[in-house]
Amino acid sequence: MNLFPAIDLRGGKVVRLTQGDYDRMTVYGEDPCAQARQFVEAGAGYLHVVDLDGAKDGTLSNYGSIAALAKQGGLYIEVGGGIRTEERIEKYLSLGVDRCILGSVAVTDFDLTARMLKRYGERIAVGVDAKDGFVAIHGWKEVSAEKGVDFCRRLADAGCTAIIYTDIACDGVMQGTNLALYRQLAAEVPGVAFTASGGISSEAELLELKKMGTAAAILGKSLYTGALDLKRCVELVQN
């Protein structure tokens, strides 16, 4: 199982939100590249980057920070937040970003998503965020009528091989992740590499996710608060 420590960017700073709420934001650092270097020193090989400004208003205000992270090297980097066009995908991939994450656009423009999956293959992942089991979009403010599991099946049929699934209720509150959900996804949507995201705050959870065949896990607030030690976690999932 791969571990993706997370860097969420707002105004070029490293921040964390609680349950996606921009009014409940904590700043953890001024220098994303320094943060990424710390992750590398702890043994990380992967990095999950979210452009929160892009997610909110579609701007590219963190483009310079993302370019610097890609240029720094040493990590497989996936980027999400505000990626709604092929032009933006091209822009990031040409920087050296390894994988782009499509979020709300996968719901609002499924045809574009299917085309991008066909064109770019494994360089595209889809982020599925669910509230009470239903797909949520636009910064989690709108909840659709489609169940997350059903949407994942549709994505798999369209050729999606990587889905980052977040249970919104768990995100940023450090009270554990929804293990039953990831077990269900693995059983009901075979052939997709699922990344668990939101609320992972113990080594026991990581081991359980690994045991059920989860492809990857994203670690955010648990690292920044010191609840989890990245070096130890990397060793744990690699053994």
Question: Which residue ranges define each predicted feature?
Answer:
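Charged helix-capping and loop-helix junction motifs
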Residues: 60-67, 141-150, 175-183
